[in-house]
From Swiss-Prot:
Binding site for Mg(2+) 2: 183
GO biological process, one term: 5-phosphoribose 1-diphosphate biosynthetic process
Source species: Prochlorococcus marinus (strain SARG / CCMP1375 / SS120)
InterPro entries: PRib_PP_synth_CS, Pribosyltran_N, PRibTrfase_dom, PRTase-like, Rib-P_diPkinase, Rib-P_diPkinase_bac
Full protein name: Ribose-phosphate pyrophosphokinase
Keywords in alphabetical order: ATP-binding, Cytoplasm, Kinase, Magnesium, Metal-binding, Nucleotide biosynthesis, Nucleotide-binding, Transferase
Originating gene: prs
Binding site for ATP: 51-53
Family: Belongs to the ribose-phosphate pyrophosphokinase family. Class I subfamily.
Stated role: Involved in the biosynthesis of the central metabolite phospho-alpha-D-ribosyl-1-pyrophosphate (PRPP) via the transfer of pyrophosphoryl group from ATP to 1-hydroxyl of ribose-5-phosphate (Rib-5-P).
């Protein structure tokens, strides 16, 4: 989004009834979104009692307003989710006209189906909890699987971080590109990414997962020799999947490997894996989840999705199309 676009929002938008409220999960991203739209965050008191209970109070009137709560449900996941639901409840009890939960990263998204007996579908449970808290709409980015949209009994707008990633990659003048899915489940995502990358060829890493957070790569389907391999995934958690894929691509002759993901979950030992020498030329992520300074490494590039989220918020408020942002 350009500065001119932001200025158009400031001049045309009825900001009197548009309110942005930030949780504690990613206040820097919330400030960037506020700057793009041209309004200040509503002040909020958020604290924890001695017994661990959370307390939230909205510090100004939001009666009759269109409220957008900005809160990725990242680590600590349960606290972030609970704080979001408490904020929703506080806004509804304060007579907000509509409350939209802006969730740049949706925690529990990987528990989107049963893979064994007697398991919970926690993504569906999380959606139910949010709806029960009173939220009217959800704006989520790069859900782990598309069917999660259907878990909500309210409107759920799904936006994508790929335009931000692709805009950055296009500045690098890369040649001989092949887009690689780190597993079979990510083929649709990688195919869409490859199409946006000037119809680049696609390769797939066939792997089998032996246990949670453990991945074993087996073989590459497709030609990666002497090419720039772009490994694309929705998130990087412990780094096992993406690093195993990069090692295999190097063995298969890829001249460079670039990892791209929307969500930098970065659970240990992600830092030590991703920062290893001669594995990645670059690791490109967005700021949907805040990356602590202690977890920065030489190859890491963090891109902001604030303008894209700000544009989506504006379009929801103005009842304009969001899908046209990604055509």
């Amino acid at each position: 989004m350009t500065a001119a676009t932001a200025q158009n929002i400031k001049s045309s938008l009825n900001t009197d009834r548009l309110k942005l409220i930030s949780g504690t999960s990613n206040p820097i991203l919330a400030k960037e979104i506020s700057s793009y739209i041209g309004i200040e965050d509503v002040p909020v008191v958020s604290k924890r009692f001695a017994d661990g209970e959370l307390y939230v109070q909205i510090q100004q009137s939001i009666r009759g307003c269109d409220v957008f709560l900005i809160q990725p449900t990242c680590a600590p996941v349960n606290d972030s989710l609970m704080e979001l639901m408490i904020m929703v409840d506080a806004c509804k009890r304060a007579s907000a006209r509509q409350v939209t939960a802006v969730i740049p990263y949706f925690g529990y998204a990987r528990a989107d189906r049963k893979t064994a007996g007697r398991e919970s579908i926690t993504a569906k449970l999380t959606a139910n909890l949010l709806v029960s808290s009173g939220v009217d709409r959800v704006l989520a980015m790069d859900l782990h699987s598309a069917q999660i949209q259907g878990y909500f009994d309210i409107p759920c707008d799904h936006i994508y971080g790929s335009p931000v990633l692709i805009d950055y990659l296009s500045t690098k003048n890369l040649d001989e590109i092949v887009v690689v899915s780190p597993d079979v489940g990510g083929v649709a995502r990688a195919r869409a990414f490859a199409k946006q990358m000037k119809d680049s060829p696609l390769a797939i890493i066939d792997k089998r997962r032996a246990a949670h957070n453990v991945a074993q790569s087996l073989t590459v389907i497709g030609d990666v020799a002497n090419k720039t391999a772009i490994l694309i995934d929705d998130m990087i958690d412990t780094g096992g999947t993406i690093c195993a894929g990069a090692e295999l691509l190097r063995k298969e002759g890829a001249k460079r490997v670039i990892a791209c993901a929307s969500h930098a979950v970065f659970s240990p030992p992600a830092y030590s894996r991703l920062s290893a020498d001669d594995l990645f030329e670059e690791v490109v992520v967005t700021n949907s989840i805040p990356v602590p300074t202690s977890q920065y490494f030489e190859q890491l590039k963090v891109l902001s999705v604030a303008n894209m989220l700000g544009e989506a918020i504006w379009r929801v408020h103005e009842e304009s199309s969001i899908s046209s942002m990604f055509r």
